[in-house]
Amino acid sequence: MEIVPLGDSALVVRVREQFEDAPEETLDEALRVFQLLQRAAIPGVIELAPAYTSVAVFFDPIAVSRSNGAANVLFDELATRIRSAIIPASRRHRRRTAARGTRLTEIPVCYDAEFGFNLDRVAEHTKLSEREVIDIHSTGEYRVACIGFVPGFTFLAGLPKNLSTPRRDVPRKEIPPGSVGIGGTQTGIYPLRSPGGWNLIGRTPLKLFDPTKDPPTLLCPGDRVRFRAITREEFESLKQ
């Protein structure tokens, strides 16, 4: 584990260098660190953001500092508190914290051409039929690695290797909310209308981000996800 500065008001706690070598173990370790830091409630820390191999710690420099020292003093002070919260955790704590992120959520997706603008591109790149792409994508189980880019956007690990497809050369300026896409070795869901360069293969009628709810996101880091193929009629029914 290493702790490195990220600007003047954040640190990154990196649990491993590579994700692909041990995906499940790496996500579990990042989630464990995230949960331990949540419980530690270190004064001055204002936000924690888990990712594939790390947790970003955003803080208020004035609240963290007990002196008027230089920036490196702030970083050293906070890094010491972070290590104190993480390193003493026993194996029992490791198992308990890692197990919390195992909620399974089923996401209905309509893969019709009306929503899957790039389904044909994925099929062509992977040398599969469009039906095979849908079947493979909707029978796998995925893990929410992190949330970012826009509020509620889920980066899902676990995409079958035979569905891996490069991002579009020219991103779209506007992608409809609920669009399900493939970008490289990842799949994910656009929660809000936004630009994006992933290959769109379908759309879910579910609302992934609602700022009036607590938490505001339907999915959280560590959650497991399965997609269920639905018809256009089911899409309209679930959207109401």
Regions found by a protein language model. Name each.
Residues M1-R96, G101-Q240:
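Glycine-rich active-site loops that engage anionic ligands at enzyme catalytic sites
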